[in-house]
A protein has these predicted regions:
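Domain-level signal for Mg2+-assisted phosphodiester chemistry and nucleotide/NA-binding surfaces
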Residues: 1-104, 110-114, 160-169
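Nuclease catalytic cores that cleave nucleic-acid phosphodiester bonds
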Residues: 82-224
Length: 224
């Protein structure tokens, strides 16, 4: 059995596999095991994510994410590593002429837009992979991401440290950079998360009850 650590790019997985599906209440341990051959013994699942900045008044998105992270924290193999989102305003030229009554339009035609970008996730993933590889904590690394920025760390771990790196890309498009350097590369088929749900309701060791958000219950779909 190969001692294996999983590194999951949470945002990449969400937009590639989970958005608009009924699989958001995902059991990361079960999902990871489903991707691998039986000769892998999963030692840890490291989940990299950032707390969302909710655009709605009722904060429903942040509440659901918080419930999910609380549920994940109870899983014995899962470790959550958080980055952050940065919000900033920019002035951009519209692709199409906006409504003339738009109060965000300036005299030069540009519009003030709100841009939210995730920070630190790729850095945190690269740091964790490099540390685990150099300290020989694992015999195999599995990256679940389609982010081209992670190609250099895949190359370093495979060719300079000498530990195999398997890449499972949640996106539909092929990432040639990751495929070039990975020991094994595969795009994850849509629907692969089916059947990998956490229990809809369960009690923790300290007596708390954790429930799946109503919007994420079986039969419900959408982007939230």
């Amino acid at each position: 059995m190969k001692n294996t650590i999983i590194y999951i790019d949470g945002g990449n997985l969400y937009y590639g596999q989970l958005r608009g599906s009924a699989n958001k209440w995902l059991d990361l341990e079960a999902f990871s095991a489903k991707l691998l051959n039986p000769d892998h013994a999963i030692a840890a699942v490291k989940y990299f994510t950032s707390r969302v900045i909710d655009k709605s008044a009722d904060q429903c998105h942040t509440q659901r994410q918080s419930q999910y992270l609380t549920a994940l924290a109870t899983r014995p193999l899962v470790k959550i590593i958080e980055g952050r989102y940065r919000e900033q305003s920019e002035l951009l030229a519209p692709v199409q002429e906006p409504c003339t009554s738009c109060d965000r339009k300036r005299a030069d035609g540009r519009i003030k837009v709100r841009r939210i970008t995730e920070k630190m996730t790729d850095v945190n993933i690269a740091d964790a992979m490099l540390r685990d590889a150099y300290e020989r904590r694992t015999e195999c690394l599995v990256l679940i991401s389609g982010d081209t920025d992670l190609a250099p760390i895949v190359k370093t771990v495979r060719y300079h440290v000498g530990i195999p790196v398997l890449v499972f890309n949640p996106q539909r498009s092929i990432c040639n950079e990751l495929r070039r350097y990975a020991t094994f590369y595969r795009n994850i088929p849509q629907g692969s998360a089916d059947g990998c749900r956490l229990p809809d309701s369960f009690e923790t060791s300290d007596g708390r009850t954790i429930r799946c958000p109503a919007a994420w219950m079986p039969g419900r779909t959408g982007d939230s």
